[in-house]
Amino acid sequence: VSHFPSCILFTVYNKDLEHKYHTISENHSFPAPLVDAIFSETHVLRIPNKFSLAPLGEHDYSSHFSINFGTDHSIATQDSELFTIVYEDTPAEYTHQLVNPHVTTDIDILYHFASQRGYANGLYFYHVENQVTIQAWKNGQFFLANRYAAENEDELFYYVMLVVDQLELPPADIHFSVIGTKQQHTSYHLLFNKYLSPLHLCNREQVEGTTDTTELAHFFGKCVL
């Protein structure tokens, strides 16, 4: 289950990780064909929620979130290897119909995906619902995870290059990657090809009839299965 602010994507895979069922709910209702279904694993992926990173092991994480987003939010936490992800825990009517769901965030999934690649300098990004999410690595160390409001390619370009400049990443020696559709990859490659290393597409296996939301749901879903 991929939980976006604007919609919920329900996707079913078989034991061989083949894509078997997919539907989109814009009113957060549970799909009728899945009501009586039994699954060996159930995952809920939160994409792209408001979030803050905080040190591990603290008793109260509310201040880390409120300093960026105010106090009028319900929050949840997820521990990663280096930090705790404090994210907005928006309610969803469908959750009571799931059995023992594993809840995780896109931030945690992308962190593990990138760390396993082992590139000394890396920048990974994706754009959905007028936000660009960026994670950056420098000299083999994790340096940044953030989201920026980006309604168009000019704003996306600005924030990607801002991260490169602020972290002093070497433009010609960076593993530069996007998660998205093939059309997005082509467009962003042209946007950045004079400034950064060639842009890689993380999710080369595309879903038929794809959109940015379905591609992100498919990519993150395959990462956790």
Residue spans for each PLM region:
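Hydrophobic/aromatic-enriched cytosolic interaction surfaces used to assemble or bind macromolecules
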Residues: 1-225
